[in-house]
Amino acid sequence: MSATKLTRREQRARAQHFIDTLEGTAFPNSKRIYITGTQPGVRVPMREIQLSPTLIGGSKEQPQYEENEAIPVYDTSGPYGDPQIAINVQQGLAKLRQPWIDARGDTEELTVRSSDYTKARLAYDGLDELRFSGVLTPKRAKAGRRVTQLHYARQGIITPEMEFIAIRENMGRERIRSEVLRHQHSGMSFGARLPENITAESVRDEVAAGRAIIPANINHPESEPMIIGRNFLVKVNANIGNSAVTSSIEEEVEKLVWSTRWGADTVMDLSTGRYIHETREWILRNSPVPIGTVPIYQALEKVNGIAEDLTWEAFRDTLLEQAEQGVDYFTIHAGVLLRYVPMTAKRLTGIVSRGGSIMAKWCLSHHQENFLYQHFREICEICAAYDVSLSLGDGLRPGSIQDANDEAQFAELHTLGELTKIAWEYDVQVMIEGPGHVPMQMIRRNMTEELEHCHEAPFYTLGPLTTDIAPGYDHFTSGIGAAMIGWFGCAMLCYVTPKEHLGLPNKEDVKQGLITYKIAAHAADLAKGHPGAQIRDNAMSKARFEFRWEDQFNLALDPFTARTYHDETLPQESGKVAHFCSMCGPKFCSMKISQEVRDYAAAQTIEVGMADMSENFRARGGEIYLRKEEA
């Protein structure tokens, strides 16, 4: 039975209440810890899951316990995951990276905004009630300077961002001493180079080689540094954004916070409705994770939704607007070339990418080459001045498994490889977007093609969905493909929610999509053999075998759902210490029986050992003391 549908007014009121009452919140039996680095201000947040001790013997009156180590885990929630930090959405988050940016001395504050659209929005007092109050004074690179993490990496500079990432990627596993927890199966990495310990130098080296990116616009100092690359943990992106028919600024900020709570490593704001500029400002000032956008969406709004009326000038103005707000990466559909559009004519589902279809329509209506391709070097110059990473969009991705791996898809991919090399000339960081809808047996080719033709730049895919028959469950159909392509080397997975193909996701849909994709990403890390990836699994298995129910809930990706499902049948507190669950009951619990078998085997070993000693004693004549030569 579905919950009662809220009205638009009720949805906005609920979101406003969420924002007004927002506090830093820890997961059950978890606490926020910080690991400090060697460079000033490097203080890396993690979540530490506290575990209960294991009963190892003794009596009912005097039981003996063995402590279980706390499990440190990667935490994307930023200040929202720390109960000690006061949260005020009206003021935004603390500017963590500002001292690092200022110390480099290669940026300058802008007295006047570069975007005409931004100037007009700021001058219009009718937007005062919607506007974020504490507007950041934007910066850009000084003349002749480049301020990208790729530029620094190529210069041999280890930035504070790189040290922060190295500590974060190691996930505090050096704190774990138990051999049981540290045990890990060998992985199959398909050529990925996974160091036993991630250092700041290894981060720098991967970024310098173009195999990884650090999305970190100088105008988004609130963000906590993270990295996207196949030699690091697989990351997950969540999409949010309003549309012309639904959602509000309050709801999008709520979805942002909610996304970071459930593990979004980055968030894309795909707003297409009114107040795109104002919504994005609220999101950026309150986001501890990198924010991506598809600038063509807003550029289209500026020409009243008529693709044919798009111009390079309007698009350039949009890039400047968003770069100075702090957007960390742009999806640019520069690979949709005029000559590729006819290749899609025989497809079952044509061009399904919104950005791809916009550019295809523009190309056909003007019979000119894609202006994003034509002006790509100018795009790179803008990105280099603010350290905006490029996510080269797959505008010709397949929208059905019938269209997977076709001529149009791979023609565009090869062009994205050419554009990657151009971006690198400007020290601009690049990742490549991928499909889409691909059956399982055809997924790996997408990864091998990308590595070969895009020079090992990080791959970022939407799924892929492995079947087309499950609307309402496409987080499952795509999670299968996401786990596979993550294993093969994909660096970041864009989540798919249950609402895919059906409607705009709400808060619960966002959670469901993220949990599904955190599972897929983690499964890929395990399969690749990422160092330390198995620690949490081992801790869960140990807690499960020892019937430490509270620890099982708390180690779960979603502790609340795990507890709810358990309590549906065993709600009493006694159920939290019972050596069985409702699936098998007390008589048929396999783990309880296994424990009994283990105890019996141990007892048998003792009895056999005693019998052997007795026989040996008799064989030696039954003497308590033996002569020295007999001993």
From Swiss-Prot:
Lineage, highest ranks first: Bacteria, Pseudomonadati, Pseudomonadota, Gammaproteobacteria, Enterobacterales
Catalytic activity entry: 5-amino-1-(5-phospho-beta-D-ribosyl)imidazole + S-adenosyl-L-methionine = 4-amino-2-methyl-5-(phosphooxymethyl)pyrimidine + CO + 5'-deoxyadenosine + formate + L-methionine + 3 H(+)
BP-aspect Gene Ontology terms: thiamine biosynthetic process; thiamine diphosphate biosynthetic process
Matches recorded under Pfam families: ThiC-associated (PF13667), ThiC_Rad_SAM (PF01964)
The protein's Enzyme Commission number: 4.1.99.17
Function: Catalyzes the synthesis of the hydroxymethylpyrimidine phosphate (HMP-P) moiety of thiamine from aminoimidazole ribotide (AIR) in a radical S-adenosyl-L-methionine (SAM)-dependent reaction.
Gene responsible for this protein: thiC
UniProt GO molecular function: 4 iron, 4 sulfur cluster binding; carbon-carbon lyase activity; zinc ion binding
Protein name: Phosphomethylpyrimidine synthase
Residues given in the record as substrate binding sites: N239, M268, Y297, H333, S353, R354, G355, D394, G395, L396, R397, E433, Y460
Keyword Repeat: no
